[in-house]
Curated annotation (Swiss-Prot):
Entry coiled-coil feature ranges: none
Listed GO MF terms: metal ion binding
Keywords: Disulfide bond, Fusion of virus membrane with host endosomal membrane, Fusion of virus membrane with host membrane, Glycoprotein, Host cell membrane, Host endoplasmic reticulum, Host Golgi apparatus, Host membrane, Host-virus interaction, Lipoprotein, Membrane, Metal-binding, Myristate, Transmembrane, Transmembrane helix, Viral attachment to host cell, Viral envelope protein, Viral penetration into host cytoplasm, Virion, Virus endocytosis by host, Virus entry into host cell, Zinc
Source organism per UniProt: Lassa virus (strain Mouse/Sierra Leone/Josiah/1976)
Glycosylation sites: 79, 89, 99, 109, 119, 167, 224, 365, 373, 390, 395
All ranges on the Extracellular side of the membrane: 2-17, 59-432
GO biological process: fusion of virus membrane with host endosome membrane; receptor-mediated endocytosis of virus by host cell; virion attachment to host cell
Residue ranges that the UniProt entry lists as topological domain Cytoplasmic: 34-58, 454-491
Protein's name in the database: Pre-glycoprotein polyprotein GP complex
Site (Cleavage): 58-59, 259-260
């Protein structure tokens, strides 16, 4: 009986010792968390900046850990399943089908057909032409808005050679004065969309209106030709033809829901149709080896359809699977892409970039892309299009704000993922309750609320990072070289 009484007398002491151990452990955690808050509140960053200001001018890293990288897509690999367009000079443009044949679209002042008719039915009965090439011409012709002057088109199929001629001149002075609403303007509009993505096309737009295209040439001639080294002004791209095709399909089925048309999901490296990582082989890239993008980036392509890079991934994926199943038969491949185009690309994106090109606004040519790579984890962002203006790619400084925003988005995604993982593993309620009760932690929280500044900004301009400005507003690298400009501290 005495032993039982002694045991119960010792219980409070045991509980007290346990509580002491718990309090010591929580105090250590509170001190460690307070030290962490001191390290991240900006004080260390401020001291580091004061020591390094005006010296470090690294341009390859953003937010300290994200490196800007680029890739260029080689769209010549798509030639077996979809027509590619490119340009040789101001007047000669080409459509590539397969490895040997194609179409030449020429702006000229010399007529090659004297008559004013086009006997398509007779040519079809005699099987005079290549049906793969003719389907491309049909897509072009059916895309011309309000084509109601059949004498403006002539064609000839002698010996299997395709020759189609559009008259761009005006028979009446009234038509010349009202060029914007004529068939000639419609032909030029469609031509610029077929040979899309080139401010190098010599068309004089003298009215300042994007839908009014004028030229000094009198004829547009389309002929079949052998495929040689024609692409001297631009690389081959399927976007022009696919843009025409999807726009014509949208005009026919105007009531379709946009999101309902996107049904193609990217397969993984094993060909499975589940969202996952996706790798671009060296055959798909220009002057680059294998590049892979993880689940996080590629899953966005399967969820959303508002990025040009996602459209190109779908085209490459479609091309790979179509070649395996169709054995690269040209006519069958073109028929398939005609039916599948609305499941692969966002025609609104193509139209938007085409209009931006005509209006002189930087646009996407679907060839070059930039993305951020985490130098430690290797995690990448979803590549975004590197915009083109006046025939050349923009300088990196023109979209530095977009790069900073992309880095912020990646940091936010990483923190959200880490938070969810931590919440699923560690019960933080008791620890946080005690931590918030310590004065050391309250001081660290106060420093966070104060928001100690860490670097200087030029008044009225964006963040200069990764450049470091001194009190005169200059950086020793030479980019910011005007001394005496007003600066202010920012966190």
């Amino acid at each position: 009986m005495g032993q039982i009484v002694t045991f119960f007398q010792e219980v409070p002491h045991v509980i007290e010792e346990v509580m002491n151990i718990v309090l010591i452990a929580l105090s250590v955690l509170a001190v460690l968390k307070g030290l962490y808050n001191f390290a991240t509140c900006g004080l260390v960053g401020l001291v580091t900046f004061l020591l390094l200001c005006g010296r470090s001018c690294t341009t390859s890293l953003y937010k300290g850990v994200y490196e800007l990288q680029t890739l260029e897509l080689n769209m010549e690999t798509l030639n077996m399943t979809m027509p590619l367009s490119c340009t040789k000079n101001n007047s000669h443009h080409y459509i590539m089908v397969g490895n040997e044949t194609g179409l030449e679209l020429t702006l000229t002042n010399t007529s090659i057909i004297n008559h004013k008719f086009c006997n398509l039915s007779d040519a079809h009965k005699k099987n005079l032409y290549d049906h793969a090439l003719m389907s491309i011409i049909s897509t072009f012709h059916l895309s011309i808005p309000n084509f109601n002057q059949y004498e403006a088109m002539s064609c000839d199929f002698n010996g299997g050679k395709i020759s189609v001629q559009y008259n761009l001149s005006h028979s009446y002075a009234g038509d010349a004065a009202n060029h914007c609403g004529t068939v000639a303007n419609g032909v030029l509009q469609t031509f610029m969309r077929m040979a899309w993505g080139g401010s190098y096309i010599a068309l004089d737009s003298g009215r300042g209106n994007w839908d009014c295209i004028m030229t000094s040439y009198q004829y547009l001639i389309i002929q079949n030709t052998t495929w040689e080294d024609h692409c001297q002004f631009s690389r081959p791209s399927p976007i022009g033809y696919l843009g025409l095709l999807s726009q014509r399909t949208r005009d026919i089925y105007i009531s379709r829901r946009l999101l309902g048309t996107f049904t193609w999901t990217l397969s993984d490296s094993e060909g499975k149709d589940t969202p996952g990582g996706y790798c671009l082989t060296r055959w798909m890239l220009i002057e680059a080896e294998l590049k892979c993008f993880g689940n996080t980036a590629v899953a966005k392509c399967n969820e959303k359809h508002d990025e040009e890079f996602c459209d190109m991934l779908r085209l490459f994926d479609f091309n790979k699977q179509a070649i395996q199943r169709l054995k690269a038969e040209a006519q069958m491949s073109i028929q398939l892409i005609n039916k599948a185009v609305n499941a692969l690309i966002n025609d609104q994106l193509i139209m938007k970039n085409h209009l931006r090109d005509i209006m002189g606004i930087p646009y996407c040519n679907y060839s070059k892309y930039w993305y951020l790579n985490h130098t430690t984890t290797g995690r990448t962002s979803l590549p975004k299009c590197w915009l083109v203006s006046n025939g050349s790619y923009l300088n990196e400084t023109h979209f530095s704000d977009d790069i900073e925003q992309q880095a912020d988005n990646m940091i936010t995604e990483m923190l959200q993922k880490e938070y969810m993982e931590r919440q699923g593993k560690t019960p933080l309620g008791l620890v946080d309750l005690f931590v918030f009760s310590t004065s050391f932690y309250l001081i660290s929280i106060f420093l966070h609320l104060v928001k100690i500044p860490t670097h200087r900004h030029i008044v009225g301009k964006s963040c200069p990072k990764p450049h470091r400005l001194n009190h005169m507003g200059i950086c020793s690298c030479g980019l910011y070289k005007q001394p005496g400009v007003p600066v202010k501290w920012k966190r």
